[in-house]
Amino acid sequence: MSIKIPFLSKQVKETELEDWDNIPSHIAIIMDGNGRWAQKRGLPRIAGHREGVSTVNRIVKTAVNANVKVLTLYTFSTENWKRPKSEVDFILKLPKEFLHVYLPGLIENNVRVQTIGDFNAVPKHTQDAIEYAMEKTKDNDGLVLNFALNYGSRYEIIHAVKQIVQKTKASELDVEQLDESYFEKHLFTNGLSDPDLLIRTGGEYRLSNFMLWQLAYTEFWFTEKLWPEFDEDTFHQALMEYQQRKRRYGGI
C-alpha cells in the first residue's frame, strides 16, 4: 500500500504500481538533458541545471513514498570538469542551494544524505553544505540520498586497486585472499547494495563511466525525456517495467 509522506505535493496512488512489495531497493539515475532542455527554450544551459534541481526534489519525494531504500544521483562526473568554467562553477553551487531549501524536509522525512566520489576536489562551499547535511541526517534510517559528486567509475576502480596494492606491499594482505567482496570494500560504494535499477534520462544509451562495477546485474531503463521533464508518472513507468522483468543473475 502507499505510504503518505507529509511533504509530498502529490501522493502516489496504489493503482499506479502493480506490486508495492516489488520495489527496487537501490535506484541509480543518470540525470541527463538539463542543457538541451534549456536550449530548446532559448535559455542558457544553467537554467536547465537550475530546473533540474526541482526535479531532484520531486523524484526524492516519489522515491520516499515508494519505499526505495537508496537513491543514487549522478550529480557531477570526473569528466564534467571539461565543461566551461562558468557552467562547472554553477553546477557545483547547486548541491548547496538544494540542501539550503530542502534539507528540513529531508530531515522530517527520515532521509539520510551521503556522497560518493573524489569529494575533496570539489569547492569547499559544496563540501561544507554536504557535510552539514550528512551530519544532520546521520541518524536517519529511511531513504539514503546518495550524491555521486566528482565521481567516475574508472577512477573509483583505480583508487581501489591502489589501496589494495599498498596493503599487499605492506604485507597486510595475501594476494590469494583477494576476492570480489574484499575488492568492493575499497570502492566508494562500500556499505551500499548494488543498484537494482538504473534510469537514464535524455535519450542517450550509455553508462558514461557510472558505477561500472556495481551495475553488473542491474536492470536498465532509458527514457527520451530530458531530466527537467522527468516526473512522478515517468518514474512510476520505470518501476512498473522493472516489476515485469525477471532477474536471473546468470541463471535460467
UniProtKB/Swiss-Prot annotation:
The family classification in the record reads: Belongs to the UPP synthase family.
The protein's gene is named uppS
UniProt record, GO biological process:
polyprenol biosynthetic process
**GO CC field:** cytosol
For this chain's record, the cofactor binding note is: Binds 2 magnesium ions per subunit.
Protein's recorded name: Isoprenyl transferase
EC number(s) per entry? 2.5.1.-
User: Short name of one Pfam family for this protein?
Assistant: Prenyltransf
Keyword annotations from UniProtKB, A to Z: Magnesium, Metal-binding, Transferase
InterPro entries reported for this sequence: UPP_synth-like, UPP_synth-like_CS, UPP_synth-like_sf
Catalytic residues in the record = 32, 80
Give a short account of what the protein does.
Catalyzes the condensation of isopentenyl diphosphate (IPP) with allylic pyrophosphates generating different type of terpenoids.
NCBIfam families in UniProt: PRK14830.1, uppS
Subunit and partners: Homodimer.
PROSITE patterns xref list:
UPP_SYNTHASE (PS01066)
Mind telling me which SUPFAM superfamilies this protein's record contains?
A: Undecaprenyl diphosphate synthase
Residues reported in the UniProt entry to bind Mg(2+): 32, 219
The residues that the entry says bind substrate are 33-37, 45, 49, 77-79, 81, 83, 200, 206-208
Requisite cofactors: Mg(2+)
Q: Which GO terms describe its molecular function?
A: ditrans,polycis-undecaprenyl-diphosphate synthase [(2E,6E)-farnesyl-diphosphate specific] activity; magnesium ion binding; manganese ion binding
